[in-house]
Amino acid sequence: MFLRLFKYLWPERYLPEAKKGDPFENPPTPLHSRTGVLMVNLGTPDAPTARDIRRYLGQFLSDPRVIEIPRYIWYPILFGPVLTFRPKKLAPKYAGIWMDGGSPLLVWSQRQAEAVTAQLREDGFDVPVALAMRYGNPSIADAITGLRGQGCDRIVVVPLYPQYAASTTATAVDAVTRHVARLRDQPALRFIKRFYDHPGYIDAQAARIADFWNMHGRPEKLVMSFHGLPRYSIELGDPYYRDCLATAELLRAKL
């Protein structure tokens, strides 16, 4: 027991001769830093089958950030009728929109990540970009492992939600930090919380709308639709509703 303790306290005295010396003389990893980007979207089933949809819904709907009611009330409902019957009903609908590369969300998210990679290279930045899904694949764990394998010891995490909500952005942050907490050599993390009012985002949205108007004519009214949240989420402090109003007003002014 004492020998093990001494080896722990003074390992250099018990290491073979070849392993002694300055530990920084031949470091196991490069000392320079490299930044990577992790883009996180919501998630998707792996295939438009009841089995894969059930797995996806189980992950998604068991997240306490998404369903904020007591587990003892919700779980019997979720693992009873919801996961028993809902996947079979959804499978034909998923199959109807499925693309060659997977679900539309996955395909377009991958294209978005590729476009960000290309833009960074064009701007002169050697920055790896990885895509992850909060629920399903590609997983956050695999994406971080991939970035670490490319030498990234700093990771900028970008949840792909312009407006902040606990059920979207916060749960992505939870998942990333939970995985990194298990690592011995942890990368430095920086999170982009939201970008609802960023000029680049507003300009991009305005340009898409203007392009549509140029092709089809300018309508009398423009309806801006955002994903909904339960009222209690707003009452508990989610800034999502305010963010949506601000985005709409900025777009209105831009157009």
Residue ranges of model-derived segments:
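Active-site-proximal alpha-helix that buttresses catalytic centers in soluble enzyme cores
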Residues: 2-255
